[in-house]
């Protein structure tokens, strides 16, 4: 058994879809439809660029100064984004996950997230990836609280969808009516109706617009589409109340990060849509990615 920078890799193929997943962070390292990349790919021998494909829990996005309070106790998380002084994207993205079940169309990975001083609730995390020839890749990310007290919890994942040759010539369709305004550290300052510059309810080209924003006002089952001018690209569907959109500028804008989130940034402090995960309770986040 050999290991690489991103652990080990599992691949499967159903109909026109093919999938690869790596064991570090349970990262989706490749998803293709009719031979065309739907997400930004990377090799198992490489470190995933910009959190690409990673599972984000027990919190998505940022926690200000790494500090939060829960049940009248204060906690201090490690700061892993020095530029903003924040704790970013949880505890599961860079740890080993284990492939516990695999078939021709499905793979399940699991990971144990140990209790630590700054997050003293042990969790078991589970990722189910299932390929369907019609609906594409169906995903369920879940976690169970193994501790003896309620745990603060949120989740997301971090695929970069590909439409045009870059984000600039990609057309974005995003049915969100509100946006989270942020400060210089990308931390929330308010939730407001989306301004014209960031409104993609009518699909349009991104051009050189910088986006690193959380959107809300999503209704029921929603779908975000990223395509080229010919309508070819990828669509992500979920029913989370929030989605982070990012133009991946540090990577050269190769695609668009579409991160369905159960809560907005800094939810450990604001409490907005933060899950109180009871002992023995399992939380589930579902979504799908398809080609078009």
What spans do the regions from the language model cover?
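Short, Gly/Pro- and small/polar-rich lid/capping loops
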Residues: 1-15
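Glycine-rich active-site loops that engage anionic ligands at enzyme catalytic sites
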Residues: 226-265
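Short Pro-Gly-centered flexible turn/kink motifs
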Residues: 68-76, 141, 276-292
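Acidic, contiguous internal or C-terminal segments within carbohydrate-active enzymes
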Residues: 19, 111-153, 157-159, 164
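Extended, loop-rich substrate-binding clefts of extracytoplasmic carbohydrate-active enzymes
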Residues: 1, 81, 85-133
């Amino acid at each position: 058994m050999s290991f690489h920078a991103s652990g080990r890799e599992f691949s499967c193929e159903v109909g026109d879809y093919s999938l690869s997943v790596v064991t570090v962070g349970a990262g989706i390292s490749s998803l293709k439809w009719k031979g065309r990349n739907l997400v930004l790919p990377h090799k198992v021998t490489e470190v995933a660029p910009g959190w690409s494909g990673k599972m984000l829990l027990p919190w998505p996005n940022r926690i200000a100064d790494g500090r939060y309070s829960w049940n009248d106790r204060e906690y201090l998380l490690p700061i892993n984004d020095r530029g903003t002084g924040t704790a970013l994207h949880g505890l599961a993205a860079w740890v080993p996950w284990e492939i516990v079940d695999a078939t021709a169309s499905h793979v399940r990975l699991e990971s144990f997230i140990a209790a630590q001083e700054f997050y003293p609730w042990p969790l078991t995390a589970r990722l189910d990836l299932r390929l369907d020839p019609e609906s594409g890749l169906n995903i369920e990310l879940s976690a169970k609280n193994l501790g003896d007290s309620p745990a603060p919890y949120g989740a997301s994942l971090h695929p970069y969808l590909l439409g045009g040759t870059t984000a600039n010539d990609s057309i974005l369709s995003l049915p969100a009516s509100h946006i989270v305004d942020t400060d210089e550290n990308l931390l929330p300052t308010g939730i407001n109706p989306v301004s014209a510059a960031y409104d993609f309810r009518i699909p349009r080209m991104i051009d050189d617009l910088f986006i690193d924003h959380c959107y809300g006002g999503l209704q029921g089952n929603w779908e975000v589409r990223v395509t080229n001018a010919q309508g070819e690209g990828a669509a992500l569907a979920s029913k989370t109340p929030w989605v982070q959109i990012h133009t991946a500028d540090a990577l050269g804008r190769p695609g668009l990060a579409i991160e369905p989130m159960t809560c907005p940034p800094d939810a450990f402090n604001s409490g907005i849509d933060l899950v109180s995960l009871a002992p023995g309770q399992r939380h589930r986040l579902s979504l799908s990615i398809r080609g078009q």
